[in-house]
Design a protein with these regions (language model features):
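Asp-box/BNR beta-propeller blade signature and adjacent active/binding-site loops
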Residues: 1-347
């Protein structure tokens, strides 16, 4: 089939951004995102969601997940992430943070029923960090929440950390240092369980140098981590990795060219999609790596802003990806693309 594009939510009164997506067991879609004043103005923020019962062809009106925050920037909701747990419940986490002092940021949790009809929360998990990965449930039953932070533990640069729970969130342990390196700013992790307790952490490098996707591995369920290496995804920001039904790995990400001048519109113009395999993501050797990359979304606006994505694959094989974009609208809004593996081409 040809790629199809959809509007998920387009409310010109607010800035809609940073979506994530989850499918229930019945394949009902829930798209969570933040509405705020602007990317650079969080004087108003609220986490909302919309639902679809027809594989994302039409969407409900927005439903509030959080209470709104009105502030001078001292507190705001940031980036929600959603997971369907093995028992069917829908777990949504989001960082509540501050532009004044990000070390005060903490992750909050909402728990929903298996169809996402009702959510309870938020519960402050008291996990320190911003822009969390999805709550990851390992095959062992361990829960992991990865988030990053700078200017902590005597280390100025951004470092990637995680917290874990072995009793379904009743008690949390950490932080565990996933990756920190004085040469880099490591953040916005996407952790993938490649085999039982073998984890690969894909990371954004935030020095505006166009570095490839940074990665490291754990062989013990996230308790310890190895050395940094790169996966051949140049300029990779906010990767979102998962398995396709073929056994291949799909990664969606913002392409961020190496340039330090300007901000929105200068280097937030493209979202890419990549297909790769287990050997590639677990190897630091170029002769063992392969990846196929295709452009997904382009924002022509002079104030372009996009590239935080979420995706699912339906049982019929269709891949459905949500993103946010400015485009020809007065403010950013939520869009989606539907495609199939054959639309991407072979490795």
């Amino acid at each position: 089939m040809a790629m199809q594009r959809f509007d998920v939510s387009c409310d010109p009164s607010v800035y809609e951004a940073w979506p994530d997506l989850v499918a229930t067991q019945s394949e009902r879609l829930l798209c969570f995102f933040c509405e705020c004043t602007h990317h650079g103005d969080r004087s108003y923020s609220r986490i909302v969601y919309v639902a679809s019962d027809d594989h994302g062809r039409t969407w409900s009106d927005k439903i509030a997940l959080s209470e709104p925050i009105h502030s001078d920037g001292s507190a705001f909701w940031n980036c929600p992430r959603a997971t369907r747990l093995r028992d069917g419940r829908i777990a949504v986490i989001c960082d509540r943070t501050s532009r004044r002092d990000e070390t005060q940021a903490e992750v909050h949790l909402w728990m929903g029923d298996p169809e996402g009809m009702h959510f309870e929360g938020p519960v402050n998990l008291h996990l320190q960090g911003i822009v969390p990965d999805k709550l990851l449930e390992l095959q062992s039953g361990r829960w992991i929440v990865a988030c990053h932070l700078g200017n902590v533990d005597g280390f100025a640069n951004l470092q990637q950390r995680l917290y874990y729970s072995d009793d379904a969130g009743a008690h949390w342990h950490g932080p565990v240092t996933v990756a920190r390196d004085a040469r880099y700013n490591l953040c916005e992790a996407s952790i993938l369980e490649v085999e039982p307790d073998l984890l690969v952490c894909f990371m954004r490098e935030n020095s505006s140098m166009g570095y490839e996707c940074m990665a490291c591995m754990s062989h013990d369920g996230g308790l310890t981590w190895g050395e940094l290496y790169t996966v051949p995804l140049a300029g990779c920001h906010r990767p979102v990795a998962g398995f396709l039904d073929t056994g291949e790995i799909l990664i969606t990400y913002r392409y961020r060219q190496g340039a330090q001048k300007g901000w929105l519109g200068h280097w937030t113009q493209n979202t890419f999609l990549a297909v790769t395999d287990r050997e590639t993501v677990c190897s630091a050797s170029r002769d063992r790596q392969q990846v196929r990359i295709m452009p997904l979304h382009y924002d022509p606006s002079s104030e372009a802003d996009l590239g935080y994505t979420g995706w699912v694959q339906f049982r019929d094989g269709e891949i459905y990806i949500v993103d946010y974009i400015r485009g020809d609208q007065p403010k950013c809004h939520i869009i989606a693309t539907a495609l199939r593996r054959e639309d991407i081409g072979g490795l």
